[in-house]
């Protein structure tokens, strides 16, 4: 049973890593791409020594990584909306509730 969990966790970590690197490549400036790529590699390397059976820590780190990835992708969506000419007020309405709490960018950008 635990070997299946270990294998699945490895798959999830690798998938998250690839999606993070892909998101970094979406940064408009090469310098920002390289900075984000370095940050991603550093974060993953710093957690490489976590024991593969420390399921709770791995789960928490995966959640953290997914949240950071969502933030990066939200930034890309906002940038795309801004470039497409969408007004700033509607962009902000997509990202914040009435109390100005961040809720993320939910609508998809049409290309």
From Swiss-Prot:
Subcellular location, principal: mitochondrion
Keywords attached to this entry: Chaperone, Mitochondrion
CDD domains per UniProt: Complex1_LYR_SDHAF1_LYRM8 (cd20268)
Source domain of life: Eukaryota
Secretion signal span: none
GO cellular component: mitochondrial matrix; mitochondrion
Function text: Plays an essential role in the assembly of succinate dehydrogenase (SDH), an enzyme complex (also referred to as respiratory complex II) that is a component of both the tricarboxylic acid (TCA) cycle and the mitochondrial electron transport chain, and which couples the oxidation of succinate to fumarate with the reduction of ubiquinone (coenzyme Q) to ubiquinol. Promotes maturation of the iron-sulfur protein subunit of the SDH catalytic dimer, protecting it from the deleterious effects of oxidants. May act together with SDHAF3.
Family to which the UniProt record says this protein belongs: Belongs to the complex I LYR family. SDHAF1 subfamily.
Subunit structure: Interacts with the iron-sulfur protein subunit within the SDH catalytic dimer.
Name under which the protein is recorded: Succinate dehydrogenase assembly factor 1B, mitochondrial
Lineage: Eukaryota, Amoebozoa, Evosea, Eumycetozoa, Dictyostelia
């Amino acid at each position: 049973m635990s070997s299946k969990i270990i294998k699945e966790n490895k798959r999830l970590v690798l998938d998250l890593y690839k999606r993070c690197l892909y998101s970094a490549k979406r940064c408009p400036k090469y310098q920002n791409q390289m900075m984000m790529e370095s940050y991603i590699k550093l974060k993953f390397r710093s957690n490489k020594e976590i024991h593969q059976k420390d399921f709770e820590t791995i789960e928490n780190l995966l959640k953290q990584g997914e949240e950071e990835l969502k933030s990066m992708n939200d930034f890309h969506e906002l940038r795309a909306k801004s470039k497409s000419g969408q007004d700033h007020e509607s962009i902000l309405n997509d990202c914040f509730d009435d109390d100005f709490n961040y809720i993320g960018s939910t609508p998809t950008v049409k290309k």
